A protein has these predicted regions:
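Short, low-order "capping/linker" segments at domain edges
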Residues: 77-95
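Long, contiguous binding/interaction regions
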Residues: 18, 27, 31, 55, ...
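Conserved short beta-strand edge segments in small beta-sheet-based binding/regulatory domains
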Residues: 28-31, 63-81
Length: 96
């Protein structure tokens, strides 16, 4: 399951603390990105994991973050995956 949370930049540290310190959520793959990657304000948190991880993340951040709309979510996920592929290509070139 994949979700993307959207929140204000001023809440970045708080959201990181909440999610990364939680025993359930911290088992998921978590990536934080500035909204500028898709031309938006704020910050995004991409979470990929089991349904249990994603539901817990939503529950823990319900007062400071919201789930991104489908279009935004897809753009953020696409950008993150593109960056991952580019990093892997660079890594492959080093050890190629």
């Amino acid at each position: 399951m994949e979700i993307v949370l959207k929140f204000d930049k001023k809440e970045l540290q708080r959201v990181k603390e909440i999610l990364l310190k939680d025993d359930v959520v911290s088992r998921a793959s978590i990536v934080f990105k500035d909204g500028e990657i898709i031309g938006k304000e704020g910050y995004y948190c991409y979470i990929s994991g089991l349904e249990e991880h994603c539901k817990r993340a939503l529950e823990l951040t319900k007062d400071i973050a919201e789930e991104a709309e489908e279009g935004e979510k897809n753009k953020v996920i696409e950008k993150i995956k593109e960056e991952g592929e580019k990093a892997n290509e660079g890594f492959g070139a080093i050890f190629g």
